[in-house]
């Protein structure tokens, strides 16, 4: 038995088999054609209404002039349709050359690989073959020089052609040609047997436009060649492979605007939740426990703070009630006129409280100085020990600094002094300064009168009118008052209390709302504290 009997039948025929089958089909068609029909035009005189339309209607002749229609015998004169079909070409073996498709629009010298054998590397049979040897240095230099000259020539021609005005081309050297005429004789060629002709290139006009119009349409070159198919033929996919290749669409877990129906297994597979194990960190438990403990301690602290606040509020309330009871008891005793033995103690306690309050103010002042800015601190320390007269008497002239001790001259040469027994034994009378200090009119005017030079910018030109204006005049005066009394021009003046108003007010403050005045009198050392009041 032959080996071909075991092999399966081929699914495709080879090129030789296809050509043989085509030839056999053509021979069978020729054998089956029994009658060969040949069409001829009607004879002359019977061609009325006949119009030639096919090539067979013309026969072997040309057009019919008596028939006035467009005629194309042998398709002469007919416009051919444009077609991109290529003519079939065959190789020396008679096979169709399919590489003509890849060679369309390419030069004939271009190497195009269109066969499978072109991908297989050639086997080197002889390593010493001269065609396989690398060229030497001289050949490389020669080829390089030729390439450079050719490129320079091409580039120079294109650059010169693009320029509107160019220099004249360099003329070729003259050529000398020896000419021997065919007609020899005295009558011909001036009797000369030979002539030497000097051939010179004709000068070209640089501004001359081109004489010939080149409008040749060059066919467009083919695109990149198709990629060779290097994979096995496609085979039909099985149902299992089709199901495996079904990729679920990208559907969000929150939005599904198109309303796709996604199986739950596909959605979980796309989500990837089951691909990893969930591991809870132990720090979460520690954090929860710490938060619980902190919350419990905070609640306990709040509860204890609330209890302490309630206790303090209760004590404060009791203390306030006790104070109110004491004040009520003292008020009842004052209404009843009952003397208390603690009045003296209250006066001493009040003095101690005043001293304590003054010391507290001094300490507060020292703290403020320590916390103040450097510039402000220096200013406060400078004004701390100044005399009160320097602070308030801003208009006095600046006293000259001298090392001599100054005395009040009014204390000398007085009739009342240590030898006069202090005004007849009245040691409580304070009349040492019985006259005004520097009571001159000029000094009073300089202190209590604004300066024109300094205050003119503030008050303007009506300074005199403002000074003369009585700004502190009452609308309604007392009866019996002297309106013609001249106003004072000096400093503030004081007078003694002639009616004892200060004593009366002091007793009223001491007894408060008591109906019966107390028999106790003020101490003697406080008797003359309020004997002077301010006079305006």
Swiss-Prot record:
Keywords: Acetylation, Isopeptide bond, mRNA processing, mRNA splicing, Nucleus, Phosphoprotein, Spliceosome, Transcription, Transcription regulation, Ubl conjugation
Record carries keyword Transcription: yes
Listed Basic and acidic residues bias regions: 467-489, 503-530
Biological processes annotated in GO: cellular response to retinoic acid; intrinsic apoptotic signaling pathway in response to DNA damage by p53 class mediator; mRNA splicing, via spliceosome; negative regulation of DNA-templated transcription; negative regulation of transcription by RNA polymerase II; positive regulation of mRNA splicing, via spliceosome; positive regulation of neurogenesis; positive regulation of transcription by RNA polymerase II
Cellular component, GO, one term: nucleus
Entry's localization field: Nucleus
Top-rank lineage group of the source organism: Eukaryota
Record region (SNW): 174-339
Its job: Involved in pre-mRNA splicing as component of the spliceosome. As a component of the minor spliceosome, involved in the splicing of U12-type introns in pre-mRNAs. Required in the specific splicing of CDKN1A pre-mRNA; the function probably involves the recruitment of U2AF2 to the mRNA. May recruit PPIL1 to the spliceosome. May be involved in cyclin-D1/CCND1 mRNA stability through the SNARP complex which associates with both the 3'end of the CCND1 gene and its mRNA. Involved in transcriptional regulation.
Subunit annotation: Identified in the spliceosome C complex. Associates with U4/U6-U5 tri-small nuclear ribonucleoproteins (U4/U6-U5 tri-snRNPs). Component of the minor spliceosome, which splices U12-type introns. Interacts with SKI, SMAD2,SMAD3, RBPJ, RB1, PABPN1, MAGEA1, SIRT1, FOXN3, U2AF2, PPIL1, DAXX and ATP1B4. Interacts with VDR and RXRA; preferentially associates with VDR:RXRA heterodimers. Interacts with NCOR2. Interacts with MAML1. Interacts with NOTCH1 NICD; the interaction involves multimerized NOTCH1 NICD. Forms a complex with NOTCH1 NICD and MAML1; the association is dissociated by RBPJ.
Protein name: SNW domain-containing protein 1
Organism: Mus musculus
Lineage, uppermost ranks: Eukaryota, Metazoa, Chordata, Craniata, Vertebrata
